Amino acid sequence: SIAGPKVLEHIVDTVLQFEGDQHYMYRILRSIKNRFGSTAELGIYEMRQDGLRQVSNPSELLLTQDHEGMSGIAIASAIEGIRPFLIETQALVSSAVYGNPQRSATGFDIRRMNMLLAVLEKRVGFKLAQKDVFLNIAGGLKVNDPAIDLSVISAILSSNMDTAIEPEICMAGEIGLSGEIRPVNRIEQRIGEAEKLGFKRFILPKYNMQGL
């Protein structure tokens, strides 16, 4: 956001914001204000030696090429702005050995992760209160789409049980406080992006299947 009074922001027609971690090569260009179009659009760029270059297919770059047999990894079909892309959700769950359990999330809201952990413990019965839980969205991106909830809990449970999720599976679904998997919007676009990259199975909320 622009520092100080919002006078300058009111004067201009468009306000753009770059997001990204300095340790990663990818940057997201978001529209905070746009008098001539939607603020839901975004662009993904790659920082190279010769400058920024647009990423035409971010899904291919954000996924690990071979994670077969690796626990703690789940693939989600997310939508940021108007474009769908696949992201890799990584989780590591281990016994807390230094007193209070640690909770850490990179690229995902830590408060939402704590809520999902509470749902897993209260509604499903998984005992994670004495476990360290680390979550990472690969590529250094920050994702706010609630549809990746399902991949977050899948990655956490996969790591906790040390059981890998089949690499051909993609998913999308929002998790409610009662433990239900809630429907998400634009499911056709999400599935289409997964099919384009060769995923053979897609896990989605039951309600979303009615319109397919």
Short names for language-model regions:
Residues 1-212:
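Peripheral, non-AAA+ core regions of ATP-driven protein-machinery
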